[in-house]
Amino acid sequence: MSAHSMLCERIAIAKELIKRAESLSRSRKGGIEGGAKLCSKLKAELKFLQKVEAGKVAIKESHLQSTNLTHLRAIVESAENLEEVVSVLHVFGYTDTFGEKQTLVVDVVANGGHTWVKAIGRKAEALHNIWLGRGQYGDKSIIEQAEDFLQASHQQPVQYSNPHIIFAFYNSVSSPMAEKLKEMGISVRGDIVAVNSLLDHPEELQPSESESDDEGPELLQVTRVDRENILASVAFPTEIKVDVCKRVNLDITTLITYVSALSYGGCHFIFKEKVLTEQAEQERKEQVLPQLEAFMKDKELFACESAVKDFQSILDTLGGPGERERAAMLIKRINVVPDQPSERALKLVASSKINSRSLTIFGTGDNLKAITMTANSGFVRAANNQGVKFSVFIHQPRALTESKEALATPLPKDCTTDSEH
């Protein structure tokens, strides 16, 4: 293929990938974190290729083969093949074995955060040679990168489980490398290829300094990897088993939302209080109770003493008879436990969003290794900003409104009907 044909092909690929990346970002409600970053990287690549086409930049033909497109394409294809993609090109912080702070870029975070994917576009020959110490100075082997992923994942639990790691190879991987990764507990996706016997002259295996990711024929003659001999083709696992956390900790906001008259059909009012009218409108658009019920199903329910005590106090002041009755039934289903906030929760610095009550409730859930259900997203964000990431299920808030209905204006029948369709 001539350099011009290759350039045209690369430009066409870049344009297609931009469309796919944009579509990917739109596929999830609220978008995919890092989606804009992925698109901008692809657009930068396209801009560079167009400059080459216009004659503004002169590059070697070999460099055309080794642009970032191969890696970016691998990221897009990985994201398209996985469920519940929450972010791409996500940067995680972790501490290495020497106690130094490091960062790690995870190409695709999927399955609601439970799966980390590294997408690899480099050819099996190059990867295998780096692993055997025949790479350029400073090249980090895939196995070394896998060790970094494992270390980082153990410091970033999702719902108290370490994320599952998949290395997705789009230009094959040698059988010994695939085996080593599996031994480490990392899943492999891609073609696993055979390795030929050792050559007689290992000194011939030293790569030249000008090698790109897409090696020329001279390297293929001396490499041990036989890409024609595919031993196995492994697809992404269709079902990645996740250890679902079966413990749920209920925050005061969730207890209130669960028993609120708004959640039981009392949302067809215009209340004196603007915030209640807004919540009623939200409820007519999207019912919150089915979401809570679905998440709580088949799980053990907990609440700390402080949460229950404050909930009862609010209920005694503002609750209507139906709300109190539902509250009594709900409390019977809950294991009420003493306040026992975790150590990391106690390290949080108080602020407008972080008060002692929230700290106690979320910290107790953390200590129980439970997912805290809450409408208090402000606390969750503030804690996250201080480096403490709690396992949470966030929902819309609903206040106690039954006692407010007498002074509220009922919505006309046609309004309530229209809003429900």
Swiss-Prot record:
Organism ancestry: Eukaryota, Metazoa, Chordata, Craniata, Vertebrata
InterPro entries according to UniProt: DUF1308, DUF5614
TM annotation in the entry: none
Organism encoding this protein: Bos taurus
Coiled-coil regions, chain positions: none
Protein name per UniProt: UPF0415 protein C7orf25 homolog
Family under the similarity heading: Belongs to the UPF0415 family.
